[in-house]
UniProtKB/Swiss-Prot annotation:
Pfam families: H2O2_YaaD (PF03883)
InterPro entries: YaaA
Annotated TM spans: none
Protein name from the UniProt record: UPF0246 protein Sden_2729
Similarity section: Belongs to the UPF0246 family.
Organism for this UniProt entry: Shewanella denitrificans (strain OS217 / ATCC BAA-1090 / DSM 15013)
Top-level taxon in the UniProt lineage: Bacteria
Length: 258
């Protein structure tokens, strides 16, 4: 299975990575083209475009100005250890064994506004450029126009390399929109996680994000070969609901936390 996840706004470049093993992003030429567009922006324009504070806008203006493609381990960090946030809390990369980390390298991909598609051990520099950003560029008025079919082609290439035809979409809608679903050369499965609150099961963002990370970890650890094995997912109290599920959208429920 090939697993797709979103990146995170929260980054950790303070703590050293747990391994020196690393790879380089495949789409750095495209990243550099985007950076050139970002370098044209003033901090005031960045604040407006990204809807962030003046402080964060200033930080990212400096990051854009300093970005260069020949980065090395030390100034850069592997994506799976650099991203922090609810999905990555659930995934808990810091506790992966060497074998599990290699499995993640083969079966996990991180969608990115700046880097397109990342392998877990791909080095990245600190950045903020969400996929939904309406950044004017040579190809159009946003990042979806910029990336076009490029990310989808990389997903299809990774799908072939990892050996089967199942794509598990654990990314947010904002990020998965960068993938052209009709051009995918595999079966797409999008799990849904619902928590019970006040007697009703519904998607609660904080819990759902962590659950996506938990399922990504489950896939890396258990290496399920088919959907029957995938729906055996039962971490953190979630269980499969046959009644609410379809083959392309398995639903997992969790009862109200006491």
């Amino acid at each position: 299975m090939l697993v797709l996840v979103s990146p995170a706004k929260t980054l950790d470049f303070e703590n050293p990575p747990l391994t020196t093993e690393h790879t380089r992003p495949t789409l750095l030429d495209q990243s550099q083209a985007l950076i050139k567009e970002c370098q044209k922006l003033t901090p005031v324009q960045i604040a407006s475009l990204m809807k962030v504070s003046d402080k964060i806008a200033g930080l990212n203006a400096a990051r854009f100005a300093q970005w260069q493609p020949n980065f090395t381990l030390g100034e850069a960090k592997q994506a799976i250890f650099a991203f922090r946030g609810d999905v990555y809390t659930g995934f808990d990369a810091d506790s992966l064994s060497a074998a599990q980390l290699q499995s993640a390298q083969n079966h996990l991909r991180i969608l990115s506004g700046l880097y397109g598609l990342l392998k877990p051990l791909d080095l990245i520099l600190p950045y903020r450029l969400e996929m939904g950003t309406r950044l004017e560029n040579a190809k159009g008025s946003n990042l979806y126009a910029f990336w076009g079919e490029i990310i989808t082609d990389e997903v299809n290439r990774a799908l072939i390399e990892q050996g089967d035809d199942i794509i598990v979409n654990l990314a947010s809608n904002e990020y998965f929109k960068a993938v052209k679903e009709k051009s995918l050369k595999g079966r797409l499965v999008t799990p849904v996680f619902k928590d019970c609150k006040n007697g009703q099961y519904k998607v609660i963002s904080f819990y759902a994000k962590k659950a996506r990370g938990l399922m990504a970890r489950f896939i890396i650890e258990q290496q399920p070969k088919d959907l029957t094995a995938l729906i055996s997912f039962d971490l953190d109290g979630y269980y499969y609901s046959e009644a609410q599920s379809t083959p392309s959208s398995p639903v997992f429920l969790r009862d109200e936390q006491v």
